[in-house]
Design a protein with these regions (language model features):
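A conserved amphipathic terminal alpha-helix motif
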Residues: 113-155
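Hydrophobic-ligand binding "helix-grip"
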Residues: 63-112, 118-120, 147-152
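Hydrophobic ligand-binding cavity/cleft-lining segments
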Residues: 1-53
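Hydrophobic beta-strand positions in extracellular immunoglobulin-like domains
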Residues: 15-17, 60, 117-119
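Short structured motifs
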Residues: 10-11, 41-45, 59, 85-87, ...
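Mid-length scaffold segments of soluble, non-membrane domains
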Residues: 40, 49, 54-68
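Short Pro/Gly-enriched beta-strand edge/turn motifs at strand-loop
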Residues: 25-28, 56-60, 82-88
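Intrinsic-disorder/low-complexity, polar/charged segments enriched in Ser/Thr/Lys/Arg/Asp/Glu/Gln
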Residues: 8-16, 53-55, 72, 97-99, ...
Length: 155
Protein backbone atom coordinates (compact mmCIF):
# COMPACT_ATOMS: atom_id res chain seq x y z
CA UNK A 1 0.00 0.00 0.00
CA UNK A 2 1.26 3.43 -0.94
CA UNK A 3 0.21 6.41 1.16
CA UNK A 4 -0.34 9.49 -1.00
CA UNK A 5 -1.22 13.05 0.11
CA UNK A 6 -4.70 14.07 1.29
CA UNK A 7 -5.74 10.67 2.61
CA UNK A 8 -5.28 8.92 -0.73
CA UNK A 9 -4.16 5.29 -0.86
CA UNK A 10 -2.87 3.27 -3.80
CA UNK A 11 -3.09 -0.48 -3.44
CA UNK A 12 -2.36 -3.47 -5.62
CA UNK A 13 -2.83 -7.21 -5.27
CA UNK A 14 -2.06 -10.04 -7.66
CA UNK A 15 -2.65 -13.77 -7.90
CA UNK A 16 -1.55 -16.52 -10.25
CA UNK A 17 -4.17 -18.97 -11.46
CA UNK A 18 -4.48 -21.98 -13.71
CA UNK A 19 -7.74 -20.46 -15.03
CA UNK A 20 -7.39 -19.31 -18.67
CA UNK A 21 -7.51 -15.55 -19.35
CA UNK A 22 -10.75 -15.62 -21.41
CA UNK A 23 -12.65 -17.18 -18.52
CA UNK A 24 -11.32 -14.66 -15.98
CA UNK A 25 -12.33 -11.89 -18.40
CA UNK A 26 -15.82 -13.37 -18.74
CA UNK A 27 -16.24 -13.26 -14.96
CA UNK A 28 -14.83 -9.72 -14.57
CA UNK A 29 -17.16 -8.35 -17.25
CA UNK A 30 -20.29 -10.13 -15.99
CA UNK A 31 -21.26 -6.80 -14.46
CA UNK A 32 -24.82 -7.57 -13.43
CA UNK A 33 -23.78 -10.64 -11.43
CA UNK A 34 -20.68 -9.30 -9.65
CA UNK A 35 -22.67 -8.79 -6.45
CA UNK A 36 -23.37 -12.54 -6.37
CA UNK A 37 -19.74 -13.47 -5.75
CA UNK A 38 -17.71 -10.34 -4.80
CA UNK A 39 -17.66 -10.04 -0.99
CA UNK A 40 -19.32 -6.94 0.46
CA UNK A 41 -20.70 -5.86 -2.93
CA UNK A 42 -24.45 -5.59 -2.35
CA UNK A 43 -25.52 -4.25 -5.75
CA UNK A 44 -24.07 -4.05 -9.26
CA UNK A 45 -26.26 -2.60 -12.03
CA UNK A 46 -25.26 -2.06 -15.65
CA UNK A 47 -26.51 1.47 -16.37
CA UNK A 48 -25.21 1.95 -19.92
CA UNK A 49 -22.99 0.31 -22.50
CA UNK A 50 -21.61 1.82 -25.68
CA UNK A 51 -18.93 -0.26 -27.36
CA UNK A 52 -16.13 -0.88 -24.86
CA UNK A 53 -17.34 1.82 -22.44
CA UNK A 54 -19.61 0.77 -19.61
CA UNK A 55 -21.33 2.65 -16.81
CA UNK A 56 -21.95 0.66 -13.68
CA UNK A 57 -23.76 1.61 -10.46
CA UNK A 58 -22.43 -0.30 -7.46
CA UNK A 59 -23.05 -0.34 -3.75
CA UNK A 60 -20.91 -1.97 -1.12
CA UNK A 61 -21.53 -2.53 2.56
CA UNK A 62 -19.52 -3.97 5.41
CA UNK A 63 -19.05 -3.79 9.15
CA UNK A 64 -16.15 -1.73 10.41
CA UNK A 65 -15.50 -1.30 14.13
CA UNK A 66 -18.99 -2.61 14.85
CA UNK A 67 -20.67 -0.09 12.56
CA UNK A 68 -22.22 -0.73 9.16
CA UNK A 69 -20.47 1.28 6.43
CA UNK A 70 -22.04 1.62 2.98
CA UNK A 71 -20.79 3.38 -0.12
CA UNK A 72 -22.16 3.92 -3.61
CA UNK A 73 -20.29 4.68 -6.81
CA UNK A 74 -21.17 5.28 -10.43
CA UNK A 75 -18.22 3.91 -12.38
CA UNK A 76 -17.13 4.31 -15.95
CA UNK A 77 -15.24 1.28 -17.19
CA UNK A 78 -13.20 0.94 -20.34
CA UNK A 79 -12.63 -2.55 -21.68
CA UNK A 80 -9.41 -3.26 -23.56
CA UNK A 81 -10.12 -6.86 -24.45
CA UNK A 82 -7.11 -7.65 -26.64
CA UNK A 83 -4.87 -6.68 -23.71
CA UNK A 84 -7.19 -8.09 -21.00
CA UNK A 85 -7.30 -4.70 -19.22
CA UNK A 86 -10.36 -3.21 -17.54
CA UNK A 87 -9.89 0.37 -16.31
CA UNK A 88 -12.43 2.09 -14.08
CA UNK A 89 -12.97 5.51 -12.56
CA UNK A 90 -15.69 6.99 -10.40
CA UNK A 91 -17.99 9.49 -12.08
CA UNK A 92 -20.04 10.08 -8.94
CA UNK A 93 -20.13 8.55 -5.50
CA UNK A 94 -19.23 8.49 -1.84
CA UNK A 95 -15.47 8.90 -2.32
CA UNK A 96 -13.43 11.83 -3.56
CA UNK A 97 -11.47 9.45 -5.76
CA UNK A 98 -12.00 5.79 -6.68
CA UNK A 99 -10.18 4.46 -9.74
CA UNK A 100 -8.04 1.60 -10.87
CA UNK A 101 -7.80 -1.40 -13.12
CA UNK A 102 -8.02 -5.14 -13.44
CA UNK A 103 -5.34 -6.70 -15.64
CA UNK A 104 -5.02 -10.28 -16.81
CA UNK A 105 -1.74 -11.64 -18.16
CA UNK A 106 -1.33 -14.91 -20.01
CA UNK A 107 1.17 -17.30 -18.44
CA UNK A 108 2.41 -20.66 -19.79
CA UNK A 109 0.45 -22.50 -17.09
CA UNK A 110 -2.58 -20.20 -16.78
CA UNK A 111 -2.78 -16.51 -16.02
CA UNK A 112 -2.16 -13.79 -13.48
CA UNK A 113 -4.80 -11.37 -12.28
CA UNK A 114 -3.78 -7.93 -11.01
CA UNK A 115 -6.13 -5.52 -9.23
CA UNK A 116 -4.96 -1.93 -8.68
CA UNK A 117 -6.96 0.68 -6.79
CA UNK A 118 -6.44 4.33 -5.91
CA UNK A 119 -8.95 5.57 -3.35
CA UNK A 120 -9.45 8.83 -1.49
CA UNK A 121 -12.10 8.98 1.18
CA UNK A 122 -14.55 11.80 1.66
CA UNK A 123 -13.77 14.56 4.11
CA UNK A 124 -14.09 13.16 7.60
CA UNK A 125 -13.65 9.54 6.47
CA UNK A 126 -10.95 7.99 8.67
CA UNK A 127 -8.84 6.46 5.88
CA UNK A 128 -6.31 5.22 8.41
CA UNK A 129 -8.98 3.04 10.01
CA UNK A 130 -10.13 1.51 6.75
CA UNK A 131 -6.81 1.04 4.94
CA UNK A 132 -6.24 -2.46 6.34
CA UNK A 133 -9.78 -3.35 5.31
CA UNK A 134 -9.09 -2.04 1.80
CA UNK A 135 -5.98 -4.22 1.55
CA UNK A 136 -7.93 -7.29 2.70
CA UNK A 137 -10.76 -6.49 0.27
CA UNK A 138 -8.42 -6.37 -2.72
CA UNK A 139 -7.14 -9.86 -1.95
CA UNK A 140 -10.59 -11.28 -1.23
CA UNK A 141 -11.95 -9.76 -4.46
CA UNK A 142 -9.18 -11.44 -6.46
CA UNK A 143 -9.89 -14.78 -4.79
CA UNK A 144 -13.63 -14.36 -5.39
CA UNK A 145 -13.14 -13.74 -9.12
CA UNK A 146 -10.87 -16.77 -9.38
CA UNK A 147 -13.31 -18.95 -7.40
CA UNK A 148 -16.23 -17.92 -9.63
CA UNK A 149 -14.16 -18.59 -12.76
CA UNK A 150 -13.20 -22.00 -11.36
CA UNK A 151 -16.87 -22.76 -10.61
CA UNK A 152 -17.86 -21.83 -14.18
CA UNK A 153 -14.89 -23.70 -15.65
CA UNK A 154 -15.97 -26.92 -13.93
CA UNK A 155 -19.60 -26.55 -15.07
Amino acid sequence: MERLPSGTRRLAAQLRSEIPSPLLWEVLTDYEHLDQFIPNLTSSVLVHREGETVRLQQEGSQKLLGLRFSAQVLLELNEFRPDWVLRFSMLKGDFRRFEGSWQIRDLPDGSSLLYELTVQGCLGMPIGLIEERLRDDLSSNLRAVEAEARRRFKS
